[in-house]
Amino acid sequence: MTTLTAQQIACVYAWLAQLFSRELDDEQLTQIASAQMAEWFSLLKSEPPLAAAVNELENCIATLTVRDDARLELAADFCGLFLMTDKQAALPYASAYKQDEQEIKRLLVEAGMETSGNFNEPADHLAIYLELLSHLHFSLGEGTVPARRIDSLRQKTLTALWQWLPEFVARCRQYDSFGFYAALSQLLLVLVECDHQNR
């Protein structure tokens, strides 16, 4: 990626972690349709590989603003996709895709991090991977830890996530009939792919 700074990429990962970790509340729903968010999306679209995914997400948000009971409908989508059985869902856990659920724990230890007691989900939840990537990008921007060490850990995290993210995204696209979380997951997929190629 060429136009986004490490801090901006960190912010995108943190934002996505938040949206995949729990249902949107009224404040978040208002925020994603705000002018400030439109500016943020414009910035993301300045990165050519992200443009199509951001456009898709913006279209879903525009449709969302005229959807009756939008928050309740999105909550139902979230629950159906991420909290039910895996038969017609996209469970946001590495272990649901036959991946080593201990890998993220090792990566967190290597980064000097641990999961928060406030987050009542297993450590292999998608949001944990995204929070770790956010932390690593912020650390790259600060320059307090050698960049080579952070970059190595970032690549390991991206590789571990890439083992199951495409299948997760495919399931989001298959089972999210409204399309908000499908569009969000597509943006994440493209972001991770770009980040992974930016060695």
UniProtKB/Swiss-Prot annotation:
Record's protein name: Chaperone protein TorD
Database matches in InterPro entries: Chaperone_TorD (IPR023069), DMSO/NO3_reduct_chaperone (IPR020945), HscB_C_sf (IPR036386), TorD-like_sf (IPR036411), TorD/DmsD_chaperones (IPR050289)
Keywords attached to this entry: Chaperone, Cytoplasm
Known function: Involved in the biogenesis of TorA. Acts on TorA before the insertion of the molybdenum cofactor and, as a result, probably favors a conformation of the apoenzyme that is competent for acquiring the cofactor.
Origin species: Escherichia coli O9:H4 (strain HS)
Single GO cellular component term: cytoplasm
Family statement: Belongs to the TorD/DmsD family. TorD subfamily.
Compartments, as annotated in UniProt: Cytoplasm
Keyword Transferase: no
Any GO BP: protein complex oligomerization
